[in-house]
Amino acid sequence: MTIYLTGSPTRYGEPSFTEDNGFLADVKASLAKATGGHPPRVLLVSAAPDDRGFTDSVLKGMSDCIHCSGIETESITMLDRRNASQAPSLVENAHWIILCGGHVPTQNKFLHEINLKSLLQGFKGVLMGCSAGSMNCAGTVYSHPELPGEAVDPEYKRWLKGLELTDIQLVPHLDQVRYASVDNLRLFEDIAFPDSWNHRFYTFRDGGYVKITDGKPTLYGEAFEISRGAMRRVCEENKTYSFMNLIFISPHFPQTYWHFCAGAKANGVNVLGIADTNYENLPLELRQNLDDYYKVDNLEDYEQMYRAVAWFAHKWGKIDWIESNNEYWLEQDARLRTDFNVTTGIQTDHIAAIKNKSEMKKYYALGGIPTARQIKGAEGLAKVKAFAKKTGYPIIAKPDNGMGAGGTAKLRDDKELEAWFKERQNDFALYVFEEFITGLLVSYDAIYNSKGEPIFENNSVFPTPVMEIVHKNLDCCYWTNKTVPAKLAAIGRRTVKAFGIKSRFVHLEFFQLDRDREGLGKKGDYVGLEVNMRPPGGYTPDMMDYAHQTDVFQIWADMVAFDEARKPVGESAYVGYVGRRDSRRYKHSHQDLLDRYGQAMCMCERVPYALSDDLGDMAYIARLQSKAEIEAFFKYATEEYA
């Protein structure tokens, strides 16, 4: 069922449905989808079922409006007291149900009498509410006083049980009611504002509307939220608001993550930040894209984090997303989601599968994805020695739960293995050992929607492993490809499916074999290394933007708000990254690089200290048209004096 909640589908005085905010075109598209392009059977549901004169005038007016809007119909029927007994068959045969405007309590009573809530179960057409009809779609209907005497009547019921099609409570016809009074009480300041301390209402001018698809509401046009005794604008004309509350954890680090907040806010999401920095010390770009902020003393103190989320939930209502997009906080994100019943991300019971390298193996196997052989350090020195004898040296020791190259070591023989165990005698059980595989390190980076479908894909290539860059203090050079190789896309998608991941940015690492390896594959095949359920680190998201002329931060935000990509992708190119070291003497200066690459140079800046071990001290990013140009860029930028 597709639902439209309107004050009125027309602007005042217009003879047809308004085209503002794309309303008429959207309704026509929904009707065509519901009927297969055939004229719909329309059922109007009266708000005054016993007032024949009023009901007949509404039938004529709505019929004229529908036809003036260019919508052909098979039939238009009014459901009121006269044919109430036929309600089941009328609803069953309708393609388009319109809940008419009028007196909310009167219509509400009639809807219950005909048992409309039950009749709508399984309805797959279009339902449109007008004024009272929209208000009665809510689970709990806010029936604010409207007629003389209602505001001062102690028996008048402001809260009614509705159709439970939405939890959105509307105060329609903003232009007409903003300064209206009932029984000498101002409707907003004296009635709605006080009632909003424990509720949240939305109000907009005629021409605005809410569309609900697959249970997800989106508001179109200028609108205001009334809550906690005040009114604030939540959406502007010709823009959308998604009724979502997103808690973004540590939005100030990495430094580019404010773009995620900006993208979500642009989509009408309420962006609520939690960090351990004073608000005034947050970057201006971030502050401008936060709707609220809660400072904790320590982001690792779960009790403080729990209180922060609880405070937002009390103030803003149901929390829809909790996200950091940061490997370090994945476990805490999952725990908070689980404790607050936020179902849009990974829960506690699945976190080990994406954090522990030993657990990852099980899911790789489910997807038929080859991986390096592995043994847990907890098996002990003797068994790890036997493992190394079977696979051959070198072997790689790495934390079972860890990110980046931290704690990773290449062990070349029994002597180095024994020394490693001696040095790690207190925590060797926290490590795993894997056979050493030679090949090209590549990544499959993608954003997936809630259906497990990729809405954006990218491939980056890392000719020198991060472990080697860190341990040898090398320059960092890697690139983003123009396209994702078909075989990599296939194994990347299979991996995501095996891990059961949806609604996420993913960064999956693979080795592309440089020779045939028994049990793993042929030269050129891909072998699973590890999964990272977050965006790639460092400047890679920016490189993806440059490579594909898009905005991956916005695409992620589109996934959050709309479950689809709305940001287009342009013509693709190669984008290369060079991270130079302050400790090295280069033949070509900073200015030489800028002069040589000119407009091809997309970015050059100092790398944050926290990232410099991996990425170098000075970053240069260039957009080029061929792999040969990328290699020439690397050679020129990293050439040193002998």
Segments (PLM) and residue ranges:
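A conserved helix-loop-beta module that forms one wall/lid of the active-site cleft
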Residues: 337-407
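C-terminal and late-domain segments of enzyme folds
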Residues: 1-37, 56, 143, 147-240
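Peripheral (often C-terminal) accessory segments that flank ATP-dependent C-N-forming ligase machineries
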Residues: 555-642
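Conserved ATP-binding module of the ATP-grasp superfamily
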Residues: 370-372, 390, 394-397, 408-443, ...
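ATP-binding N-terminal substructure of ATP-dependent carboxylate-amine bond-forming enzymes
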Residues: 240-349, 627-641
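N-terminal beta1-alpha1 cap of cysteine-dependent amidohydrolase-like domains
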Residues: 1-96, 100
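ATP-dependent carboxylate/phosphate-activation module, predominantly the ATP-grasp catalytic core
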Residues: 415, 435-501, 505, 512, ...
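Catalytic nucleophile loop
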Residues: 98-100, 121-140, 326
